Regions:
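Pocket-edge structural micro-motifs
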Residues: 38, 89, 113
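Auxiliary, metal-adjacent structural segments of Zn-dependent hydrolase domains
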Residues: 54-107
Length: 157
């Protein structure tokens, strides 16, 4: 599966992502990628896998890079990003059942790529903020002492 010399740019990027970050970028998800997710069962999360067209997937990868990955260093992604990022065409939030752009669990982050071509710059900025918020929420929730603030930070001035 992993081939950093592949002529298929999607397979090549997925391979490079794995070897660079020791994490997975999943473009053809099935329920085993998010349902049990190592520690808990996410049986309410509903996704529609992305269309398995190389150009569609490549645009999704570029979208992910532009809105999220390019903001962080290799070391940061290796140390703090979820074990897998899962690209999907559609997703329903497991709490409210409404369409969602992204969803994180302890070891994964699902990112929708279906309507990426139709987004205005403002919508892209909002989507990017949602992705960053989801990643930082996941980091804050699951990593002890990630952000070590001095006691003085909490005093009211």
């Amino acid at each position: 599966m992993y081939d950093t010399n592949s002529s298929n740019k999607v397979i090549k990027f997925i391979s490079q992502y794995y070897y660079t970050y020791d994490h997975f970028l999943i473009t053809d998800p099935d329920s085993s990628d998010y349902l049990y997710n190592f520690s808990s069962k996410n049986e309410l999360l509903e996704i529609t896998p992305p269309e398995q067209d190389e150009e569609h997937l490549w645009k999704g990868i570029e979208f992910l890079k532009e809105l999220l990955l390019d903001f962080y260093s290799t070391d940061f992604i290796k140390s703090h990003f979820p074990y897998s990022i899962i690209l999907v065409d559609e997703m329903a939030d497991p709490v409210f059942g409404l369409p969602a752009n992204c969803y994180t669990g302890r070891y994964f982050c699902c990112v929708t790529i279906q309507d990426m071509d139709n987004m205005s710059p403002e919508e892209k900025a909002f989507y990017s903020a949602e992705l960053h918020e989801a990643i930082w929420f996941q980091i804050g929730l699951y990593e002890e002492n990630f952000l070590d603030l001095p006691d003085g930070f909490f005093t009211i001035s």
